[in-house]
Swiss-Prot record:
CDD domains: PRTases_typeI
Enzyme type, top EC level: transferase
Protein name stated in the entry: Adenine phosphoribosyltransferase
Family: Belongs to the purine/pyrimidine phosphoribosyltransferase family.
GO molecular function, one term: AMP binding
Location(s), subcellular: Cytoplasm
Catalytic activities: AMP + diphosphate = 5-phospho-alpha-D-ribose 1-diphosphate + adenine
A UniProt-annotated Pfam family: Pribosyltran
UniProt source species: Clostridium beijerinckii (strain ATCC 51743 / NCIMB 8052)
Function description: Catalyzes a salvage reaction resulting in the formation of AMP, that is energically less costly than de novo synthesis.
GO biological process: adenine salvage; AMP salvage; purine ribonucleoside salvage
GO cellular component terms, semicolon-separated: cytoplasm
Pathway: Purine metabolism; AMP biosynthesis via salvage pathway; AMP from adenine: step 1/1
Amino acid sequence: MDLQEKIRVIENFPKEGISFKDITTLIADGEALRETINRIVKHLEDKKIDLIVGPEARGFIFGVPVAYALGVGFIPVRKPGKLPGETISVNYGLEYGEDQLQLHKDAIKPGQRVAVVDDLLATGGTVEGVAKLIEQAGGIVASLDFVIELTELKGKDKLEGYDVLSLVKYDI
């Protein structure tokens, strides 16, 4: 199945000059959603994964079913003030400025092998921050897995040394 055919592209959204890759059409198609999850699971099944981490919010959409299929837990990474327990934080760069991500302090045990699952790899800033959080908690980043990669933004360059999977690649 060609997953790219299942992703709607909306020009000039959310602003002029942006070509938005809309995953809602992919996740609305049960067969395409199953195929997406199965491809990520296949990539991870021999990596001895202990946990799946998904960044807010679309990482939850793909991360939870991957965790379920692998029989492992799912850990959310969220923006500040969204997690009720004690957290660890990392600041990460955006195109214009910085933002922060948080993880429950006790969510990852030292030495656990963790895969990050998210919808999109663009500039790499968010996933680089997530990887730092996992490592700060003592986890091992075993894989970074994306449904879509915007290759022109060169986010993969920031992820040198990590195993990276992108199911669909766009040159924007």
